């Protein structure tokens, strides 16, 4: 028997679900194997724009081996990531906290006090992903702010909470989140390429 391939847990997928489960199990001392059909993507692997379909989309039948997968079903279309990091590669790194109405929705409010149950986990996720307010309001933000004002909701407008490192633009520095044990990060330059893959290393993924 080859103990090199003996694992306590095998996890399929390395996105928000798989990578977190793998981390917590490994922290408890279990031998964990994570299987991911996509590859490791570095900053240089991402396309400059989404018109470069072969480097952006995952469509193996067309020989497109990017990281952005679109699955069409009868009543729903699912966007997902294919690569180490899974969905964290393709989400727009926005991490808003749900409003109170979300936790008290009739469809599930009777099951538990969800705000109490989940608040701590939201905080952990935001800390692990380095969530901060976007320091710059772009055209879309300003439009939303004006709309909120017109609707009498200006006090509810706030900068988007994002998992991005806002250091000096384009300057790479040692990991600022986990005492130097994580990957180097580079300051965001506001290029807007969050969903086509961050080419400078400012977006925090898994």
Give residue spans per PLM region.
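N-terminal glycine-rich phosphate/pyrophosphate-binding loop and immediately adjacent elements
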Residues: 1-106, 110-116
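Conserved redox-cofactor binding core of oxidoreductases
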Residues: 111-206
């Amino acid at each position: 028997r080859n103990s090199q391939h003996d694992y306590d847990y095998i996890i399929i997928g390395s996105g928000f679900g798989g990578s977190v489960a793998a981390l917590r199990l490994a922290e408890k001392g279990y031998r964990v194997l994570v299987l991911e059909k996509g590859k490791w993507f570095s900053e240089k692997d991402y396309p400059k724009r989404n018109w470069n379909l072969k480097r952006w989309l995952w469509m193996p039948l067309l020989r497109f081996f990017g990281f952005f997968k679109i699955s069409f079903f009868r009543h729903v279309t699912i966007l997902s990531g294919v690569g180490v990091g899974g969905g964290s590669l393709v989400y727009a790194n926005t991490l808003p906290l749900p409003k109170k109405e979300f936790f008290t929705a009739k469809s599930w409010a009777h099951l538990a006090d969800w705000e109490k149950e989940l608040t701590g986990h939201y905080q952990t996720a935001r800390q692990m992903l380095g969530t901060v307010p976007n320091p710059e309001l772009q055209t879309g933000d300003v439009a939303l702010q004006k709309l909120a004002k017109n609707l009498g909701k200006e006090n509810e407008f706030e900068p988007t909470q994002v998992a991005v490192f806002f250091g000096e633009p384009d300057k790479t520095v040692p990991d600022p989140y986990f005492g130097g044990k994580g990957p180097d990060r580079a300051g965001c330059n506001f290029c807007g390429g969050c969903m086509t893959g961050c080419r400078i290393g400012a977006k925090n993924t898994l």
